[in-house]
Amino acid sequence: MSTPEQEVEYRQHRFSPPPGATEIFLVRHGESAPAKGDNPFELVDGQADPDLAPEGRDHAERVGRRLADERISALYVTTLRRTPQTAAPLAAKLGLTPEVEPDLREIHLGEWENGLFRRYTYEGHPIVEQLWREQRWDVIPGAETMESFGGRIRAAIGRLAAANPDRRIAVFTHGGVIGEVFAQASAAKNRFAFLGADNGSISHLVVSGENWMVRRFNDTSHLQSPFG
């Protein structure tokens, strides 16, 4: 019979990634420059490509400080300049050159690129109401289909995971992309359930083969954002 000193303790399980898994920190780019009717955004491959706003550059610096000690092995950005601008402070701290992953660029908004989506959202356009009601981007004229968007996102995450087993990577991307990743990871019935990651926020995904595990969503503690 065991004595109290010999009793075995059964502690709560602490998560650790499975062997061969990839930890991905998904960072939404910092706040970008505002859309103005008399100064439309430059387009890259048909998509709006604004620079970071001053607030966004501050977000980038804060992200760099937050992730500097997280044992990150590789950085990825998209073809849109706000993502490499956000990644720059962390890249400088780690001495890493970001790689471009084109398929993690933002959803293509068709005829509503060039800042029109922001304008029509502000004005309460009927199609914006339809978009939220139906949980589909492709109600916007000419927009990328949900099937195309979801497919390229899943393929890109799979490629990055396959290239980085047992490593941590940071991916600087966009709000729509992060929302789609976490909707797929959680099998959410509401396709827009995770739409709304804040600028400069950090979300944490663990990928092990076809298994995507949500560890953290929309962490903004480094931005000193109040609740609300």
Language model features by range: what are they?
Residues 2-25, 31-100:
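Active-site-proximal alpha-helix that buttresses catalytic centers in soluble enzyme cores
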Residues 61-68, 150, 154-162, 182:
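Generic structural signal for well-ordered alpha-helical scaffold segments
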